[in-house]
């Protein structure tokens, strides 16, 4: 674990049991959710909210609706979220929640009734200065809207506790772009430190959803050639690089028509490699933006052999532990997701600030603040991860930077 050497040099953290205290959440809320489906049958699901740590601010983290959700997963995600939020430099603690409810195949009415039933219990544990949830897997704008609406109804308070809301009721501009843009901003800082940039670089991106789309958009804006996107069916390969027109068409096709990438490739006469991931294509920069454990040791070896310079994670933990070890051993610039994809939660923090001030910032204002936050995160990673030879272990840097921020706050507040 990258924290052990640091803890060995700074015994005061060990003397006060900071790591042990961080490994256990402040509290766990678990309850049943009973709701009625379209056939009039009563359904029962389990729901959880892990309030992990609020040493530096209110609990902050997404709600996940997926059959795989259980307490063990959410406790781990809450732990990771605490470190990620600390890296943003914004006053946010860490938390995570969700349910084993599966929104796939459910009608809008069923999803609404479930969200309202869930909030009838959860609302009493939330608040702008207590716990601020957001979306995650299975929880998009629709679900956030249903939950936020029920929260207002039950609390008789117009304060919008959720982030990721629609613009019409307190959401922030730039929230859809934030994670993808932030990933590219972080990679840009990594490259700049080595006197390099995105211009004329070949970039491989996995995924074709929100994060991948906006990572591609920003990389192209910086002069890069985006040569791949992917989905669960396979990989789009465009050796000459996607154009802005192609990307706009793809956004329409994926976000509005809900189409598959292979069908988009047929329409635009683009190469589609069925069943393949994008990491075999020679590139300078790789941005895994799809899902967990999508890039394994064999993929890492392919990328390294083909001369990859930089890997920055847009998804949460897309690289396996073995893949990360290969990148670090090869001296590849590698950014873990808790640092490079923190732009999403950072912009959620900016949404909280706008709500508190009853203001709405412009697109350019939010983008500028996001860019500065990603620069600050990079600087903190360098500060805590730089080696004597000038290289930077961004994994160690991110873990130590996040830990120090939380641990110092906990030390100042005593044993509680």
Where do the protein language model's features map onto the residues?
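N-terminal ligand-binding/catalytic initiation module
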Residues: 1-174, 408-413
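Adenosine-phosphate binding glycine-rich loop
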Residues: 190, 302-416
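Short acidic, glycine/serine/threonine-rich loops at helix termini
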Residues: 110, 142-149, 173, 214-218, ...
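Buried hydrophobic packing segments
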Residues: 74-77, 147, 183-191, 215, ...
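General beta-strand structural signal in soluble alpha/beta enzymes
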Residues: 130-134, 158-162, 205, 228-231, ...
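Glycine-rich phosphate/diphosphate-binding loop of Rossmann-like nucleotide-binding domains
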Residues: 163-166, 171-282
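Rossmann-like adenosine-cofactor binding region
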Residues: 234-334, 339
């Amino acid at each position: 674990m990258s924290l052990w050497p640091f803890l060995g040099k700074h015994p005061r953290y060990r003397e006060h049991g900071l790591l042990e205290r961080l490994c256990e959440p402040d509290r766990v809320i678990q309850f049943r959710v009973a709701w009625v489906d379209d056939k009039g049958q009563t359904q029962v699901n389990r729901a959880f909210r892990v309030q992990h740590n609020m040493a530096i601010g209110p609990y902050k983290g997404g709600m996940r609706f997926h059959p795989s959700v259980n307490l063990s997963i959410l406790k781990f995600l809450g732990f990771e979220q605490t470190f990620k939020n600390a890296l943003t430099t914004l006053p946010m603690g860490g938390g995570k929640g969700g349910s084993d409810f599966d929104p796939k195949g459910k009608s809008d009415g069923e999803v609404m009734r479930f969200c309202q039933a869930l909030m009838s219990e959860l609302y009493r544990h939330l608040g702008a200065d207590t716990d601020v949830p957001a979306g995650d897997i299975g929880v998009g704008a629709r679900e956030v809207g249903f939950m936020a609406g029920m929260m207002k109804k039950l609390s008789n308070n117009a304060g919008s506790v959720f982030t990721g809301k629609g613009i019409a009721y307190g959401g922030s501009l730039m929230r859809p772009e934030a994670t993808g843009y932030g990933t590219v901003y972080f990679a840009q800082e990594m490259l700049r430190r080595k006197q390099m940039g995105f211009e004329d670089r070949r970039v491989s991106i996995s995924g074709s959803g929100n994060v991948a789309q906006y990572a591609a958009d920003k990389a192209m804006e910086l002069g890069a050639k985006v040569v791949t996107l992917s989905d669960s069916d396979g990989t789009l390969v465009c050796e000459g690089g996607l154009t802005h027109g192609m990307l706009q068409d793809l956004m329409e096709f994926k976000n509005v028509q809900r189409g598959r990438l292979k069908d988009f490739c047929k329409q635009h006469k683009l190469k589609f490699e069925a069943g393949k991931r994008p990491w075999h294509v020679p590139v300078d920069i790789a941005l895994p933006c799809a899902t967990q454990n999508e890039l394994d040791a064999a993929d890492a070896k392919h990328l390294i052999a083909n001369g990859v310079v930089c890997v920055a994670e847009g998804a949460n933990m897309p690289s396996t532990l073995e893949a990360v070890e290969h990148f670090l051993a090869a001296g590849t610039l590698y950014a873990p997701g808790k640092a490079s994809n923190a732009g999403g939660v950072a912009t959620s923090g900016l949404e909280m600030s706008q709500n508190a001030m009853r203001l709405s910032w412009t697109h350019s204002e939010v983008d500028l603040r996001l860019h500065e936050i990603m620069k600050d995160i990079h600087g903190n990673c360098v500060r805590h991860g730089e080696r004597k030879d000038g290289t930077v272990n961004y994994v160690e840097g991110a873990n130590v930077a996040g830990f120090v921020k939380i641990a110092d706050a906990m030390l100042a507040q005593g044993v509680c």
